């Protein structure tokens, strides 16, 4: 993930290898992970590669979230690391990069459209 000195995201590059078990049952986790990378942040440039790795474990399949938890953890962890490196508060770096109401409807670089949302207001309601 690349940032300006002021903490604005300029790009995200993600190479994800997911354990699909002994044989693939569903591609939903990997395909959803691909689509869901980034939001609710305004990321001008993205390159995401998602691959499944066959292992000697039980096959995996979808339950709830299907890819969202994995990619959310990755992006939010990168936000925390960037905040520490730049010297910004964890909430402030998020606030600076959230999709604004003025940008709606917002199409992500990976094709999802957000037609509504008050992401900054929601962030103000919690303590990080």
Predicted region positions:
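Long hydrophobic segments that form regular secondary structure
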Residues: 63-101
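Molybdopterin (Moco) oxidoreductase catalytic core of the xanthine/aldehyde oxidoreductase family
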Residues: 3-32, 85-124
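Conserved small/polar residues in nucleotide/adenosyl-binding loops
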Residues: 126-128
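Gly/Pro-rich active-site capping loops and adjacent beta-alpha segments
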Residues: 1-71
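General structural feature for long, well-ordered alpha-helical segments within catalytic domains
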Residues: 8, 39-42, 59, 71-74, ...
């Amino acid at each position: 993930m690349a940032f300006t000195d002021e903490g604005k995201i300029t790009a995200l590059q993600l190479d994800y290898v997911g354990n699909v078990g002994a044989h693939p049952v569903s591609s939903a986790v990997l395909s959803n992970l691909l689509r869901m990378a980034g939001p609710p942040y305004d990321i001008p440039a993205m390159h995401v590669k998602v691959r499944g790795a066959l292992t000697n474990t039980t096959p995996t399949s979808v339950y709830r979230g299907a890819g969202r938890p994995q990619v959310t953890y990755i992006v939010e962890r990168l936000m925390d690391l960037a905040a520490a490196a730049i010297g910004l508060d964890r909430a402030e770096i998020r606030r600076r990069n959230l999709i604004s109401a003025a940008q709606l409807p917002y199409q992500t670089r990976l094709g999802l459209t957000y037609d509504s949302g008050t992401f900054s207001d929601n962030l103000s309601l919690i303590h990080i």
